[in-house]
């Protein structure tokens, strides 16, 4: 097992090395954090890009394995298949396709924690370092808005988009007062489904039903206006791109309420189970 830039907090070794039988090569800029199931045979510590280049130069392999090329082709084809999807509420794949189309390579996305985070990790391609910040490890709900304010203070010339579920947004939405006071015209895109989507997803996967995860949302447009920000509501799939364009022209913080179809969560779980856990 070759682990590149791997942190045991993000994907516990027990999930892929439960019996401790894999030999591990650890490639990272820092020494490995050792535990019972993560004990590398070899550690390559240093700049990851340089280390991989040196390994490549010394490798006898001349072509990429066919199975990985095929997997990449499948993922690209799946990603592109949502380009013209007009279903509503919007699928998370389509939302992120449009977001990636709109955001520049150097612009910054700050992800909150929830079901949307799983989709961002799967669907949002990054072209430059530190342009997609995700709270893993402790997985802190409510990070997106204050994180976006901080990013905008540091990089005022860049577009900064906070992406959050409705649950995570309401945990720290009062920081929109801070955003306004500090003159940071961030934009928050809310994946709105009136529930704690990731917990519901896990409950459905494990138990086939869910409980105690649904709630009522405020009117996010009026909520924004009450804080002297600007609010938008996506009413159809074709709305999202022009709303993003308009929101980033504003001089005040903005909130975009975008209904999401999280029936895609269970479909993804079933697809991954069938493909990789046979």
Task: List the predicted regions and their residue ranges.
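Glycine-rich, acidic loop regions that bind phosphate or pyrophosphate groups
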Residues: 1-71
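Active-site diphosphate/adenylate-binding microenvironment
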Residues: 73-151, 157
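Short beta-alpha connecting loops at secondary-structure transitions
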Residues: 34-42, 130-134, 171, 200-212
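Glycine/aspartate-rich loop-and-adjacent alpha/beta segment that forms the canonical ThDP
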Residues: 12-17, 204-207, 237-278
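Thiamine diphosphate
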Residues: 1-9, 118-196
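Conserved thiamine diphosphate
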Residues: 43, 51, 57, 204-243
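A short alpha/beta connector and helix-capping loop motif
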Residues: 39-52, 175-192, 270-271
């Amino acid at each position: 097992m070759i682990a590149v830039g791997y942190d045991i907090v993000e994907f516990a070794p027990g999930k892929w090395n439960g019996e401790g039988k894999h030999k591990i090569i650890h490639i990272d800029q820092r020494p490995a954090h050792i535990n019972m199931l993560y004990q590398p045979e070899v550690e390559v510590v240093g700049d990851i890009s340089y280390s991989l280049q040196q390994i490549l130069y010394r490798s006898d392999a001349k072509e990429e394995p066919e199975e990985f090329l095929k997997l990449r082709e499948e993922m690209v084809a799946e990603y592109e298949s949502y380009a013209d999807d007009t279903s509503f509420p919007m699928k998370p794949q389509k939302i992120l396709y449009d977001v990636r189309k709109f955001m520049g390579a150097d612009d910054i996305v700050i992800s909150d924690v929830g079901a949307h985070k799983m989709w961002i990790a799967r669907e949002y391609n990054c072209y430059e370092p530190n342009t997609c910040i995700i709270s893993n490890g402790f997985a802190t709900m409510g990070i997106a808005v204050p994180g976006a304010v901080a990013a905008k203070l540091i990089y005022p010339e860049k577009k900064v988009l906070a992406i959050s579920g409705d649950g995570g947004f309401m945990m720290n939405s009062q920081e929109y007062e801070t955003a306004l006071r500090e003159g940071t015209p961030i934009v928050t895109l809310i994946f709105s489904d009136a529930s704690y989507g990731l917990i519901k997803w896990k409950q459905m996967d494990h138990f086939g039903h869910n409980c105690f995860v649904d709630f009522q949302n405020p009117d996010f447009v009026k909520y924004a206006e009450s804080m002297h920000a600007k609010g938008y509501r996506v009413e159809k799939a074709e709305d999202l791109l022009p709303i993003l364009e308009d929101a980033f022209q504003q001089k005040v913080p903005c909130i975009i309420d975008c209904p999401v179809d999280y029936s895609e969560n269970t479909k993804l779980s079933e697809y991954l189970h069938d493909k990789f856990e046979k």
